[in-house]
């Protein structure tokens, strides 16, 4: 047993300079674990509650000292003496201590910090790297890195309506080759934008964030960059979008403010279909608002046999919402964010439910990140075959990509790159 001996939380800063929670946990056998909690900019309304202090005179109200206090004074006394390796029992206890449906008492940032710290301590106690501890010998497939090279939406002061334009280098034999291709396209894109006289400042996730005349202009520049870097769009590198449509959806009118006009759901569906006919798009995240279940079901029925539709705000890594989507035929892919649901156990449950029902899973960072690399290990451990963690720039993003390089090296000849197999719905563009 990895008996928990001590738990301690502190307030630290994330990649946007906002406070977040760090939890340090030690077991009686000397194993140590640290849990660093990320934070999102565009968040789903159904996400687990992130506890903030609300004192506008300190960090603009974004302090997390109350979440830290919840760990040190409420959670720690209850979990000391428990087996850190019994992840479900530990997480269930914290959820019970909270006693609300959305972790609205203690805060998901408090609970997740302890959950992650226990996970790391247990892996160290077992003498295993995290991906091996979680996934056993089955964890050997390196994910396709969906790299956010142009930022918009809430990540870049709405330079474009669409929040993320990602490249997906799936047409390569190894992860390291794919990463290299993505990096080369990223740097080439900077030159393409400069030649057009466009700003090359960066958004929250390291992608370029120039103000565009239309959402489609970004796609054209990315296509130019892929070709200029010496790669073939569609065959080697595809495009993924995170529309984050809830951010520009008007609940009162039921319409989307898109490209400067009010658009209804029928228009948006046709727009997406036209886009995928024109560009090698393999994945669209949050094409409709987070409660637009009928629209989600409609687009999945119409285009789901040729495209991946990823539920982020729709599903919030919540097994209950995922089950509703399965029942309705809404979406065909789950975005996985640990802090959306607030515990390791519930995150693993969501991935397993998705897999059992034919949904793909894409493990994801948040816009407010830390140097933590849990999501890299998680993607390999659960064979999700996809990860998104920003542009190949900014240390908190690159740390995740570098961790995958380490894992690839550790796995040696047993390492496999997911490549085309990551996007099983996208038969139009991808090799058989």
Curated annotation (Swiss-Prot):
Listed GO MF terms: magnesium ion binding; phosphopyruvate hydratase activity; protease binding
Protein name stated in the entry: Enolase
Presence of the UniProt keyword Metal-binding in the record: yes
Broad class of the protein's primary localization: cytoplasm
PANTHER family, alphabetized: ENOLASE (PTHR11902:SF1)
Organism: Bifidobacterium longum subsp. infantis (strain ATCC 15697 / DSM 20088 / JCM 1222 / NCTC 11817 / S12)
Top EC class of this enzyme: lyase
Organism lineage string: Bacteria, Bacillati, Actinomycetota, Actinomycetes, Bifidobacteriales
Signal peptide: none
E.C. designation(s): 4.2.1.11
Annotated active site: 205 (proton donor), 337 (proton acceptor)
Localization of this protein: Cytoplasm; Secreted; Cell surface
């Amino acid at each position: 047993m990895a008996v928990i001996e001590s738990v301690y939380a502190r307030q630290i800063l994330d990649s946007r300079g906002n406070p977040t929670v760090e939890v340090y946990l030690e077991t009686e056998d000397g194993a140590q674990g640290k849990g660093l909690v990320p934070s999102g900019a565009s968040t789903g309304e159904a996400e687990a509650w992130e506890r903030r202090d609300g004192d506008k005179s300190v960090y603009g109200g974004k302090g997390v000292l109350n979440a830290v206090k919840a760990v040190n004074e409420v959670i720690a006394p209850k979990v000391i003496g428990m087996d850190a390796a019994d992840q479900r029992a530990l997480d269930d206890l914290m959820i019970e201590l909270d006693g609300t449906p959305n972790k609205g008492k203690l805060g998901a940032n408090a609970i997740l910090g302890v959950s992650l710290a226990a996970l790391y301590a247990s892996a160290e106690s077992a003498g295993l790297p995290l991906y091996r501890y979680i996934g056993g010998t089955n964890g050997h497939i390196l994910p396709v890195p969906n790299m956010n090279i142009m930022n918009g939406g809430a990540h870049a002061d709405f330079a474009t309506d669409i929040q993320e334009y990602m490249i997906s280098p799936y047409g390569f034999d190894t992860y390291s080759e794919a990463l290299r291709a993505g990096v080369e396209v990223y740097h080439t894109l900077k030159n393409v934008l400069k030649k057009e006289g466009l700003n090359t400042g960066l958004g929250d996730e390291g992608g370029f964030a120039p103000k565009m005349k239309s959402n489609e202009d970004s796609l054209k520049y990315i296509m130019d960059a892929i070709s200029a870097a010496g790669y073939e769009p569609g065959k080697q590198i595809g495009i993924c979008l995170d529309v984050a449509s809830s951010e520009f959806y008007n609940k009162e009118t039921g319409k989307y403010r898109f490209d400067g006009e009010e658009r209804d759901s029928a228009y948006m569906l046709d727009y997406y279909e036209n886009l995928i006919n024109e560009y090698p798009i393999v994945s669209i995240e949050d094409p409709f608002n987070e409660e637009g279940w009928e629209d989600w079901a409609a687009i999945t029925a119409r285009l789901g046999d040729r495209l991946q539709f990823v539920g982020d705000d729709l599903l919030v890594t919540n097994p209950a919402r995922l089950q509703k989507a399965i029942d309705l035929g809404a979406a065909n892919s789950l975005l996985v964010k640990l802090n959306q649901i607030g515990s390791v156990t519930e995150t693993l449950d969501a991935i397993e439910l998705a897999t059992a029902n034919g949904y793909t899973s894409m493990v994801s960072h948040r816009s407010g990140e830390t140097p933590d690399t849990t999501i890299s290990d998680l993607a390999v451990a659960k064979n999700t075959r996809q990860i998104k963690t920003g542009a190949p720039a900014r240390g908190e993003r690159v740390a995740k990509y570098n961790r995958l390089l380490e894992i690839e090296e550790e796995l040696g000849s047993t390492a496999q790159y997911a490549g085309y197999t990551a996007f099983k719905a996208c038969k139009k563009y991808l090799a058989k």
